[in-house]
Structure formats: C-alpha cells, structure tokens
Curated annotation (Swiss-Prot):
Species annotation: Polaromonas sp. (strain JS666 / ATCC BAA-500)
Any Pfam family hit: Peptidase_M17
UniProt name for this protein: Probable cytosol aminopeptidase
One biological process term in Gene Ontology: proteolysis
GO molecular function, a single term: manganese ion binding
Amino acid sequence: MDFELKLLPLARICSEKCDALLVLIPQDLSAGGDDPLSALAALALKAGDLEAKPGKLLSAYRTPGIAATRVVLAGVGDASPRNVRTAVNAAMANLKNGNTQRVVVSLAAMNNAQPEIVRAAVVACSEAAYVYSTTKSKVSPVKLQRVVIGVNELSVARPGFDKALALVKGIEFAKEWANRPANHATPTLLAGAARELARLRNIKVEVLGPKEVAKLGMGSFMAVAQGTSEPLRFIVLRYEGAAKSVAPVVLIGKGITFDTGGISIKPAAEMDEMKFDMCGAASVLGTFRALAELQPALNVVGLIPASENMPGGRALKPGDVVTSMSGQTIEILNTDAEGRLVLCDALTYAERFKPRAVVDIATLTGACVIALGGVRSGLFSNNDELAQSLAAAGESSLDPCWRMPLDDDYAEGLKTNFADVANVAGRAGGAVTAAKFLHRFAGSFPWAHLDIAGTAWKGGAAKGATGRPVPLLLDYLLGQVTAAAPRKAQPKARSAKRSKPVSRTRA
C-alpha cells in the first residue's frame, strides 16, 4: 500500500476523485464553511446522525458536489493522536473489506495537523490494512492500493508523514518475522533477516555461530541452545549514522524462536504462541529497518541472541549450574526461565561498545502480563533519566510503558547455596525478580529492560504480532540525536574470575 501527502483544504478536497473520502471531525469543528463537505458535516452533527466522539462513523454515497464515491465522517473528539488512531482504525477496518482501492484521509477539518496527528493516521491505516501472507498458499489480494493524507499545510505535516512511513516499514518488518511459524523463523533464518538489512545504508551485520560464542565464554546462552538441533546465532547489527567517537545506544532483543519451556515444559494449550518469544528480536530488526529510512545522526548497536528452547537429550536440567560470560555462575531452577539466560550474556557482550545506554527488549514473564495486561509494557531501569526518556517516548508514540520497581529486596529470592545466583525466585513479583536477575549483569552502564510479554502479540481471533515496541524505540532513539556525545571511559565491569563454561554445545 502506497501513501501520499497532499495539500487538500476542505474546499479543494470536494473535487478529489477517490473510492472513499475519510474526513476526521473534531468536537470543535469550525462552522461556516460554504463547501459541500463542511455543509454535510455541520448538518450531520446538528441532526445528531454523527457524534464527534472517537470511533463514531457516518457514511454517505454519491453526495452532490463531492467527487468521492463514498464519504465517511469520523469523530475524533479532541483530535488527540490517540483519538485519531481510534477513528482511522474504525473507518479503515470497514473500508478495506469492500472494493475500495484509493482512499483520501482528510485532516483538514482539524486546522493544522501536527506531525503526531499525521503519524497516528498513517500508522492506523497501515495497521488496518496489514495481512500476513508468507506461509499461505492462496492469498486474497488487498484491494486497497493507495492512501492520500490530505492536510492544510504541507510544511507542518511533512515531518510526521516521513517519520510515519519509516515507522510503518519498521513495524511491518517486525510483524513479518514475529508472525512466521518457528520452522520459518529459525535462528539461522533470523540471521538472514538481519543480513537483508545490511543491504541498506549505514547498516552492518555480523553473525556469530556456536564456535564463536563458545570462544567468548557465553556459557549461559549456550546452555539454553544445547537441547535443540537448530544451531544458535548471535546477531550483531550496527547502524552508523554518526562519527565513531559518538557512543552508541545498544538494543538487545530476546531471540528465542520457539520456547517449549525445555525440561520444565509448558502446557500444550496455546503453546503455538511461543513462536512469538522472539518478538524482542523482531522489534530490534524493525527498529533498524526504520533507522535505515530516516538516517538519524546517531549510532545504534543491536544484539540478538537467537536460539530455540527445546527438551532434547542434551537439554539443560533443573539443578544444573552454568557459567555466564561475566564469570558469574547461575543455578537453573526452571528451564522455562531461559530468556534471562540468553540476555545476561548479551548484556556482558554490550560492555565492549562503551554504550551511552543499553535497552533490552524481551517477552520475559507471564507475571508482567498479569500486572499490566496488554496495554503497557513493563519498564525497569537503573537510571532515572533513561527511564524517563523511554516512558516519554512511549507516550508520544502511543506505545506506552509503565515503570516498575527494582528494589534490592527483590533480589533476596535469587539467592542459592549452589551458585552465585538462581535463575528464578518465587512466584510473587516474578516480573521484578526477573529484572533483578538481569540487573546483576548491567552494572557498568545506564540500562533499561522492557518486558513486552503482554504487548508483543494478541491472541484470539486477532492473533498476531503487534510490532510493539518499535514505535517506542524509534521515538526514544530519535530523541537521543541531539544528546549524542563522544564515548567516555566506562568503569571496568565487576565480575568474578571467569572459568570454563559448564555447558557445552555442538559446533
């Protein structure tokens, strides 16, 4: 589907030929326009046939004086970005099912459409029209081919429009890989997706296999992978949009391409959804796809530890002790708490980049779903400035998160008699204790953890990946462009003396 930004005031839009004209109507709509469209909106509001509330719709066909075949008036209340998204989603869900090929979305009734409004409208159109088709033998063609965003001032709307197009590409790239079945998105294939991104400007990719990972001493990551015949991959992406002296932001995405739980096996019900356990990795890939479009002046590193978690004959067992890349030993009390085991080695690896900040993204805990549901992602951080920046980015991008506690008392449950740390505590506060485990490996840099277990995908009839938190991550990164600073010497990471990893893996 193609998008176009066009100067179309209300008076001019009446002569715009299209299959459907979607006009967003705010609650403070100015009266007095003498064009047919303004007259139609005023009459509908006065008669009570239309309410200027988000999601309220009124359709009219072959309206005199209007060239569009169909006119849809959609209320947007106070015209906030959130309300615009709600209105466009409602209207486009209806329009995409007909023979509509060209839609004009008019923001002209809202006076000057700010960039955030334009972005919300474009992203909502994309979400409504998205259809996964990669593994289907027969696909009904999407009839909707073009969406024109009509505004009063191009100069005001252009920044939001350009950003929205990049964001749409990032979200759809993330959705594509998250939605693929596990046998179509193995660690090797995921590495191929990263290599695909390396064709784009300023992106470089390096892929490490089992031998390289073993040489690095990533015993925790290797332990998770030893139960599967699919070889692990450690994917390193670099977006280099600034000078080498500029310290990068590091994004780490959990890449468990299928999670059975291992020996601590999950129940069979809805286990198919465990293909979504790599949504953190998919969000990193999607963010890099968007960065390639926008070319911001900053440096970003993406790290993806990719593996399956399977109950094979060599699989990790409850009670095993493994040695992480940091040298810390970990007792495995539950093999279904594998995400933190791959992330902890990635956090240690991130130290070599002397990062400005590190953000890990993971479908980590069911406890976070219980706490926050599917509305907000869980945010944990050891740095207030970083946490505030991420939270603000979540609000502005309509991809919200909620900061959770990281009190030291939560780490008490991770104590064990047999290693430096256990990989799980009790059930209480499970999202927090998981974050406290990761916190141990992030002591030398500003760090944040986004638990997206409740927001990365939807179940039921609308089952599929959401593409979150690509919008949040992109907004955060773009906000860091002016804050870019040369690398500073980082304090040496405190770690125990490294010993040979307990767990081994196939080459």
